[in-house]
Amino acid sequence: MSATRRVLVLQLCLMALSGCYCQGTLIESLESLKNYFNSSSMDAMEGKSLLLDIWRNWQKDGNTKILESQIISFYLRLFEVLKDNQAISNNISVIESHLITNFFSNSKAKKDAFMSIAKFEVNNPQIQHKAVNELIRVIHQLSPESSLRKRKRSRC
């Protein structure tokens, strides 16, 4: 197994273990995955972390939702690649279920919508046309003024 895969699995383990409420089956699945990729070895820990250093830097600013969504997307894509491996498929299912429960509020529809965005083909002219057409609304929704108005309305 490549060192990159080992590091990825280790990062997933650390993310999942950072919550004190982890279930026994989740911990067992993480340990099994870690053993499968031999992520406990020192070569998996060499150099910078894959995701955690970036995450820590974003946490200093207090705005991690965007980065969290990228990290979750990364792991879901990783699981998609690894799901056919019979030796670890059950462990991946347990971990993926945990991520869906915590990040997507246990909504498979939200997860599917989230993943569909990652699969858009940016070279497709029709996708480009629609994306540019929707861009002004997206920017408006993301602007600080828009969120400020939403907060003011919710207080009333």
From Swiss-Prot:
One of its GO terms (molecular function) is cytokine activity. Released primarily from activated T lymphocytes. Its main location: secreted. Residues 1-22 form the signal peptide. Gene3D superfamilies: 1.20.1250.10. The keyword Glycoprotein applies. Glycans are attached at residues 38, 91. The modification Pyrrolidone carboxylic acid is found at residue 23. Keywords: Antiviral defense, Cytokine, Glycoprotein, Growth regulation, Pyrrolidone carboxylic acid, Secreted, Signal. GO terms for cellular component: external side of plasma membrane; extracellular region; extracellular space; perikaryon. Transmembrane segments: none annotated. InterPro entries: 4_helix_cytokine-like_core (IPR009079), Interferon_gamma (IPR002069). GO terms for biological process: adaptive immune response; antigen processing and presentation; apoptotic process; astrocyte activation; CD8-positive, alpha-beta T cell differentiation involved in immune response; cell surface receptor signaling pathway via JAK-STAT; cell surface receptor signaling pathway via STAT; cellular response to interleukin-18. The keyword Secreted applies. It is found in: Secreted. Type II interferon produced by immune cells such as T-cells and NK cells that plays crucial roles in antimicrobial, antiviral, and antitumor responses by activating effector immune cells and enhancing antigen presentation. Primarily signals through the JAK-STAT pathway after interaction with its receptor IFNGR1 to affect gene regulation. Upon IFNG binding, IFNGR1 intracellular domain opens out to allow association of downstream signaling components JAK2, JAK1 and STAT1, leading to STAT1 activation, nuclear translocation and transcription of IFNG-regulated genes. Belongs to the type II (or gamma) interferon family. Homodimer. Interacts with IFNGR1 (via extracellular domain); this interaction promotes IFNGR1 dimerization. This is Interferon gamma. It comes from Rattus norvegicus.
